[in-house]
Amino acid sequence: MDKLEMHHLIMAAKARKGLSWDDLANAVGKAPVWLASVCYGMNSAPLEVATHLCEVLELDDQVAATLTAFPVKGWDKSIPQDPLIYRLYEVVGVYGPPLKDVIQEKFGDGIMSAIDFSMHVERIEDPKGDRVLLTLNGKFLPYRSW
Protein backbone atom coordinates (compact mmCIF):
# COMPACT_ATOMS: atom_id res chain seq x y z
CA MET A 1 0.00 0.00 0.00
CA ASP A 2 1.33 3.46 -0.84
CA LYS A 3 0.91 6.64 1.20
CA LEU A 4 -1.84 8.00 -1.10
CA GLU A 5 -4.00 4.90 -0.71
CA MET A 6 -3.36 4.99 3.05
CA HIS A 7 -4.46 8.64 3.14
CA HIS A 8 -7.72 7.88 1.31
CA LEU A 9 -8.54 4.99 3.66
CA ILE A 10 -7.84 7.11 6.74
CA MET A 11 -9.89 10.06 5.49
CA ALA A 12 -12.83 7.77 4.65
CA ALA A 13 -12.69 6.14 8.10
CA LYS A 14 -12.35 9.52 9.82
CA ALA A 15 -15.45 10.81 7.98
CA ARG A 16 -17.42 7.59 8.55
CA LYS A 17 -16.78 7.85 12.31
CA GLY A 18 -17.37 11.62 12.42
CA LEU A 19 -14.03 12.27 14.13
CA SER A 20 -11.95 15.45 14.06
CA TRP A 21 -8.16 15.71 14.04
CA ASP A 22 -8.43 16.85 17.67
CA ASP A 23 -10.42 13.69 18.51
CA LEU A 24 -7.85 11.44 16.85
CA ALA A 25 -4.88 13.31 18.32
CA ASN A 26 -6.34 13.03 21.82
CA ALA A 27 -6.95 9.31 21.29
CA VAL A 28 -3.32 8.62 20.34
CA GLY A 29 -1.64 11.27 22.52
CA LYS A 30 -0.16 13.41 19.75
CA ALA A 31 -0.69 16.93 18.35
CA PRO A 32 -3.43 17.33 15.71
CA VAL A 33 -1.23 18.98 13.05
CA TRP A 34 1.50 16.35 13.42
CA LEU A 35 -1.01 13.50 13.27
CA ALA A 36 -2.69 14.99 10.20
CA SER A 37 0.72 15.30 8.50
CA VAL A 38 1.33 11.59 9.17
CA CYS A 39 -2.07 10.72 7.72
CA TYR A 40 -1.35 12.87 4.66
CA GLY A 41 1.85 10.85 4.18
CA MET A 42 4.33 13.63 4.97
CA ASN A 43 5.66 12.11 8.23
CA SER A 44 5.90 8.63 9.73
CA ALA A 45 4.46 7.44 13.02
CA PRO A 46 5.97 5.18 15.68
CA LEU A 47 4.42 1.69 15.56
CA GLU A 48 2.43 2.15 18.78
CA VAL A 49 0.82 5.37 17.47
CA ALA A 50 0.05 3.81 14.08
CA THR A 51 -1.46 0.72 15.71
CA HIS A 52 -3.58 2.74 18.12
CA LEU A 53 -4.82 5.05 15.35
CA CYS A 54 -5.81 2.06 13.23
CA GLU A 55 -7.68 0.56 16.19
CA VAL A 56 -9.62 3.81 16.66
CA LEU A 57 -10.41 4.02 12.93
CA GLU A 58 -10.95 0.25 12.54
CA LEU A 59 -8.31 -0.02 9.82
CA ASP A 60 -6.05 -3.01 9.17
CA ASP A 61 -2.39 -3.72 9.85
CA GLN A 62 -1.45 -2.78 6.29
CA VAL A 63 -2.51 0.82 6.98
CA ALA A 64 -0.54 0.77 10.25
CA ALA A 65 2.55 -0.50 8.43
CA THR A 66 2.25 2.28 5.83
CA LEU A 67 1.87 4.87 8.60
CA THR A 68 5.25 3.78 9.97
CA ALA A 69 7.03 3.82 6.59
CA PHE A 70 9.45 6.68 5.98
CA PRO A 71 7.90 9.20 3.58
CA VAL A 72 9.34 10.92 0.56
CA LYS A 73 9.16 14.58 1.57
CA GLY A 74 7.87 16.66 -1.28
CA TRP A 75 4.85 18.40 -2.64
CA ASP A 76 3.43 19.88 -5.81
CA LYS A 77 5.58 22.92 -6.64
CA SER A 78 2.83 24.78 -8.52
CA ILE A 79 1.05 27.75 -6.96
CA PRO A 80 -1.60 26.37 -4.58
CA GLN A 81 -5.20 26.66 -5.79
CA ASP A 82 -6.90 26.02 -2.45
CA PRO A 83 -7.70 29.46 -0.94
CA LEU A 84 -6.49 28.66 2.59
CA ILE A 85 -3.24 27.08 1.42
CA TYR A 86 -2.73 29.95 -1.03
CA ARG A 87 -3.02 32.48 1.83
CA LEU A 88 -0.20 30.69 3.67
CA TYR A 89 1.84 30.71 0.44
CA GLU A 90 1.10 34.43 0.14
CA VAL A 91 2.14 35.08 3.76
CA VAL A 92 5.53 33.49 3.11
CA GLY A 93 5.87 35.36 -0.19
CA VAL A 94 5.08 38.75 1.36
CA TYR A 95 6.59 38.33 4.82
CA GLY A 96 9.29 35.70 4.20
CA PRO A 97 12.24 38.03 3.48
CA PRO A 98 11.35 40.48 6.29
CA LEU A 99 10.78 37.60 8.73
CA LYS A 100 14.15 36.11 7.74
CA ASP A 101 15.82 39.46 8.49
CA VAL A 102 14.13 39.77 11.88
CA ILE A 103 15.01 36.18 12.84
CA GLN A 104 18.63 36.65 11.79
CA GLU A 105 18.88 39.96 13.68
CA LYS A 106 17.76 38.13 16.83
CA PHE A 107 19.61 34.81 16.34
CA GLY A 108 22.37 35.33 13.77
CA ASP A 109 22.93 33.60 10.45
CA GLY A 110 21.00 30.32 10.35
CA ILE A 111 17.64 28.67 9.85
CA MET A 112 14.60 27.57 11.83
CA SER A 113 14.32 23.79 11.93
CA ALA A 114 11.25 22.07 10.54
CA ILE A 115 12.59 18.82 12.03
CA ASP A 116 12.98 19.85 15.68
CA PHE A 117 9.64 21.60 15.31
CA SER A 118 6.05 21.80 16.48
CA MET A 119 3.02 23.65 15.18
CA HIS A 120 -0.27 24.45 16.86
CA VAL A 121 -3.54 25.95 15.65
CA GLU A 122 -5.84 27.88 17.97
CA ARG A 123 -9.16 29.63 17.46
CA ILE A 124 -9.28 33.10 19.01
CA GLU A 125 -12.80 34.45 19.44
CA ASP A 126 -13.18 38.05 18.32
CA PRO A 127 -16.40 40.10 17.96
CA LYS A 128 -15.19 41.27 14.54
CA GLY A 129 -14.69 37.65 13.38
CA ASP A 130 -12.84 34.74 14.89
CA ARG A 131 -9.11 34.62 14.25
CA VAL A 132 -6.63 31.84 13.52
CA LEU A 133 -3.49 31.71 15.65
CA LEU A 134 -0.69 29.62 14.14
CA THR A 135 2.30 28.94 16.34
CA LEU A 136 5.44 27.67 14.60
CA ASN A 137 8.06 26.54 17.10
CA GLY A 138 11.36 25.49 15.52
CA LYS A 139 14.85 25.12 16.92
CA PHE A 140 17.29 27.71 15.58
CA LEU A 141 20.19 26.10 13.72
CA PRO A 142 23.12 28.46 13.18
CA TYR A 143 25.31 28.05 10.14
CA ARG A 144 28.82 27.12 11.20
CA SER A 145 32.14 27.97 9.71
CA TRP A 146 34.90 25.42 9.26
Curated annotation (Swiss-Prot):
Superkingdom of source: Bacteria
One GO process term, biological-process aspect: cyanate metabolic process
Any one GO molecular-function label of the UniProt entry: DNA binding
UniProt keyword annotation of Heme present: no
Taxonomic classification: Bacteria, Pseudomonadati, Pseudomonadota, Gammaproteobacteria, Pseudomonadales
Enzyme superclass (EC): lyase
Keyword Aminoacyl-tRNA synthetase appears in the UniProt entry: no
One Pfam family recorded for the sequence: Cyanate_lyase
Reactions the enzyme catalyzes: cyanate + hydrogencarbonate + 3 H(+) = NH4(+) + 2 CO2
Function summary: Catalyzes the reaction of cyanate with bicarbonate to produce ammonia and carbon dioxide.
SUPFAM superfamilies: Cyanase C-terminal domain, lambda repressor-like DNA-binding domains
Active site: 87, 90, 113
Listed EC numbers: 4.2.1.104
Protein's name according to its UniProt entry: Cyanate hydratase
Family: Belongs to the cyanase family.
Keywords for the protein's UniProt record, in alphabetical order: Lyase
Organism: Pseudomonas putida (strain ATCC 700007 / DSM 6899 / JCM 31910 / BCRC 17059 / LMG 24140 / F1)
PANTHER family named in the record: CYANATE HYDRATASE
